[in-house]
């Protein structure tokens, strides 16, 4: 339904395939003159990545290498990649007053999901070193949340927002609990070194994240490749969100 709605706004080719099928991926680049790639495709459940690491390395890292290889070979000039703040692992702050993770922090992931994304970043950066026409923006997302606040039922454009199956993200689980679609919300861990003892996370609204990707395309017209954090620079604890 989303694809059908989008095609009413502007016609485009929708091709459904697995990025591991390199020859099929390459054929897309051969048959279309592509200037920009925005690469979202990935698995993203941290707990699952610990249990099934190879699933994440194959899908997230190897498949990213496939699309980077094709993009560089067939003249793509702008490559936007959705990475994750999980690449930072457990950051060490220099002082109690410092609570913001910046791009200068060491990338030291602590799970296969974060590792698979960091390895993908290296694939992109290494290719850019040998192909000066291949520019990239890497976005390290913090916790993406929310839904399009301007959406109206029956609108021509599709609604964007959180939709996971199974649902594991905090804000949707809280909302479902409030709507009595769940019995309760469970807090895991109340002994963190934070004011209320619960984990603090930075968030970013889906609308702002979408805008960031458009800005990245424009950015690469005049600037060199770079990596950016995608968050608001301040966090909220689990109890604060509730």
What do the PLM-derived regions correspond to, one by one?
Residues 91, 116, 148, 191, ...:
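Gly/Ser/Thr-rich beta-alpha loop segments that engage phosphate groups in nucleotides
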Residues 148-168, 176-177, 183:
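Hydrophobic, Gly/Ser/Ala-rich alpha-helical and linker tracts in large acyl-processing enzymes
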Residues 2, 92-94, 148-159, 199-200, ...:
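Short aromatic-enriched loop/helix-cap "lid" or pocket-rim segments at secondary-structure transitions
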Residues 1, 170-242:
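C-terminal substrate-binding subdomain of Rossmann-fold SDR/epimerase-dehydratase oxidoreductases
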Residues 7, 51, 59, 131, ...:
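A generic fold-level signal
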Residues 1-147:
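N-terminal Rossmann-like NAD(P)+-binding domain of SDR-like oxidoreductases, especially those catalyzing
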Residues 11, 42, 93, 99, ...:
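Short, functionally important structural connectors and interaction interfaces within domains
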Residues 55-57, 99, 110-118, 160-172, ...:
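Short-chain dehydrogenase/reductase
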């Amino acid at each position: 339904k989303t694809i059908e709605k989008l095609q009413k706004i502007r016609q485009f080719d929708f091709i459904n395939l697995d990025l591991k099928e390199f020859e099929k991926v390459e054929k897309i680049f051969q048959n279309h003159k592509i200037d920009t790639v925005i690469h979202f495709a990935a698995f993203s459940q941290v707990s699952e990545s610990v249990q099934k690491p190879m699933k994440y390395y194959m899908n997230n890292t190897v498949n990213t290498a496939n699309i980077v290889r094709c993009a560089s070979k067939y003249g793509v000039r702008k490559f936007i990649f959705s990475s994750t703040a999980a690449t930072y692992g457990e950051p060490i702050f220099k002082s109690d007053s410092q609570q913001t993770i910046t791009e200068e922090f060491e990338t030291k992931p602590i799970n296969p999901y974060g590792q698979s994304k960091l390895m993908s970043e290296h694939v992109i950066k290494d290719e850019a070193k040998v192909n000066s026409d291949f520019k990239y923006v890497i976005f390290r997302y913090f916790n993406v949340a929310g839904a399009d606040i301007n959406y109206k039922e029956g609108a021509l454009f599709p609604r964007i927002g959180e939709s996971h199956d199974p649902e594991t993200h905090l804000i949707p689980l809280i909302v479902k609990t409030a709507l009595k679609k769940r019995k309760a919300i469970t807090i895991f861990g109340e002994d963190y070194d934070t004011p209320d003892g619960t984990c603090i996370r930075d968030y970013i609204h889906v609308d702002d994240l979408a805008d960031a990707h458009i800005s990245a395309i424009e950015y690469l017209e005049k600037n060199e490749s770079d990596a950016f954090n995608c968050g608001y620079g301040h966090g909220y604890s689990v109890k604060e969100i509730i």
